[in-house]
């Protein structure tokens, strides 16, 4: 993948310090993004949800923000409209909203290309992708979080960059192809890793062992992988080509054929890199 260095942490002089934001969606990302935008000095003028009560509940915690009860025209004017909705909902929402001419509309999806906006030539499309996992009750370190930007033109790009730089020191311009590759990598690093930890927890529970036993190992694994190329510091029976141990492990997984197959496939993947 092509290099994409982080951009300087400053706001372009021609972009207002305080932008007005219209927000569609009230899920985990949206619920954490809205307070961050307010803290950065922006105005979230409205939030919309398919469930009006959800929008009203979120708006009640955001000073100066109202719940938008309907998508009927006219849309309240805003500098940026952010679509914090599931990927599959972006295109239908784009088609359903009566956008003001020239509106800057950005989705927050990692795998959705900028081309999704081609069906709406009256809007200026963009991408405002926060690379992080969001969970209720867990605070986000916004300044350290990568924010990935793409836009259909220089004016839209400048505005989204200004918005991103007001939140994060890790702002990057990525093409749709780069962002898709990043999203795939993030699934391996986050979602698959978490699933493997879940399997490990379940196996320990079956043996009457506490999950805390693995905590030091998990911390060391992650710290080492961040400090060195992960393939270079790979350890374990697959690297050693320890056939008896590999066979014993697969036999121990006989009651879990899906995990047994996963173990064999991961072993093969590790050995293919040797």
Predicted segments, located by residue:
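NAD(P)+-binding Rossmann beta1-loop-alpha1 motif at the extreme N-terminus of oxidoreductases
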Residues: 3-70
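Phosphate-coordination loops involved in phosphoryl transfer and adenosine-cofactor binding
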Residues: 15-18, 102, 144
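Amphipathic, non-transmembrane alpha-helical scaffold segments
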Residues: 48, 186-189, 193, 263, ...
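Rossmann-like NAD(P)(H) cofactor-binding subdomain of soluble oxidoreductases
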Residues: 48, 52, 56, 60-139
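Internal alpha-helical scaffold of NAD(P)-dependent oxidoreductase catalytic cores
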Residues: 54-61, 119-122, 139-226
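Predominantly flavin-linked oxidoreductase catalytic cores and closely associated redox partners
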Residues: 131-139, 153, 206, 231, ...
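Interdomain hinge/lid region at the active-site interface
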Residues: 219-274
